[in-house]
Amino acid sequence: MQLIGLTGGIASGKSTIASRLAELGAAVVDADRIAREVVEPGTPALAEIRRAFGDGVIAPDGTLDRPELGAIVFGDPAALRILNGITHPAVLRESTARFEAAAVADPDAIVVYDVPLLVESANRYPFDLVVVAHADAATRARRLFELRGMDPVAAERRIGSQVSDAERLSAADLVIDTGGTLEETYRQVDALWAGLRG
């Protein structure tokens, strides 16, 4: 099994790269999806979040009120550290279980771990390769506004709450520039895949 770490800032094109790699045959483990699963009603992580941030972060149906929690943690580094201290260990445990399952199913699998906070979480996985999806901050802010309807001020705050591009790029073995067209991104991903299969 080869384990590839895929990371990048918010709206950097990680999901586009992960989807393309899945189409080509990679087993993709999505840390964001796992992060949603580990805070579902009844989970220990959701109970810890409630204790740390109060009942206001729980919606009437018992689910996590993500906008309310986001309003608390984005822009408050101490609150974000508390949240990450709750969620990251749960996500890492579940992710490890999925890597192991992929290796059992196919010892030659190429497993792509799509993990936005790879640098922030001081990830200790033995990646064979770390790939960074990169677009400049202005492009990412525009995508957040145009594609996700995020308020420009909120977009800037969200981008600013993450590690710097320089820190993220310093962790890269390979950078995929996602600032151009979709076809240009796909060409880079296809070349990566050919190298991994070679």
From Swiss-Prot:
InterPro entries for the chain: Depp_CoAkinase (IPR001977), P-loop_NTPase (IPR027417)
Localization per Swiss-Prot or TrEMBL: Cytoplasm
Listed EC numbers: 2.7.1.24
Family named by the database record: Belongs to the CoaE family.
Gene Ontology annotations of biological process type: coenzyme A biosynthetic process
Designated name of the protein: Dephospho-CoA kinase
Enzyme class: transferase
Gene responsible for this protein: coaE
Free-text function comment from the UniProt entry: Catalyzes the phosphorylation of the 3'-hydroxyl group of dephosphocoenzyme A to form coenzyme A.
Pathway: Cofactor biosynthesis; coenzyme A biosynthesis; CoA from (R)-pantothenate: step 5/5
GO cellular component: cytoplasm
Domain called DPCK: residue spans: 3-198
NCBIfam families xref list: dephospho-CoA kinase, PRK03333.1
PROSITE patterns: DPCK (PS51219)
Main location: cytoplasm
SUPFAM superfamilies the UniProt entry points to: P-loop containing nucleoside triphosphate hydrolases
Chain sites annotated for binding ATP: A11, S12, G13, K14, S15, T16
Top-rank taxon, per record: Bacteria
Gene3D superfamilies reported for this sequence: P-loop containing nucleotide triphosphate hydrolases
Pfam families, A to Z: CoaE
